[in-house]
């Protein structure tokens, strides 16, 4: 029986490496810009993944003034601080973050529709 025990492979988890918290040189910190459909034609844009060094409230204030929309900063238990803006502001937010020098263009991921 011991010969067969050695021949049987152990359980392999293909997602173990993806779930591991590694801070290697290959990992990038992406900023995710998403749009969520609310009721009717209303939508909500969320910005997640900004560095903690930045003041979220100051960025929100500039975004609201630039795009003439309302917004708030929400504390999420899993995602941390998330900026929410009214309306579909995906392209506006991504161009604003690049022009302000907050994020590089290749580090922005736009999700939605």
Curated annotation (Swiss-Prot):
Gene3D superfamilies: SUI1-like domain
GO MF: translation initiation factor activity
This protein's UniProt keywords: Protein biosynthesis, Translation regulation
Pfam families (alphabetical): SUI1
Domain of life: Eukaryota
NCBIfam families: SUI1_MOF2
Function per UniProt: Probably involved in translation.
Protein name: Protein translation factor SUI1 homolog
Species this chain originates from: Salix bakko
């Amino acid at each position: 029986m011991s010969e067969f025990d050695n021949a049987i492979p152990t359980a392999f988890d293909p997602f173990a490496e993806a779930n591991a918290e590694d801070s290697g040189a290959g990992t990038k910190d992406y900023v995710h810009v998403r749009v969520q459909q609310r009721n009717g034609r209303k939508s909500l844009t969320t910005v997640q993944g900004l560095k903690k060094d930045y003041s979220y409230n100051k960025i929100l204030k500039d975004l609201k003034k630039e795009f003439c929309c309302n917004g708030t900063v929400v504390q999420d238990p899993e995602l941390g601080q998330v900026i929410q803006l009214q309306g579909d502001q995906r392209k506006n937010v991504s161009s604003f973050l690049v022009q302000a020098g907050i994020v590089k263009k290749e580090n922005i991921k736009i999700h939605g529709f």
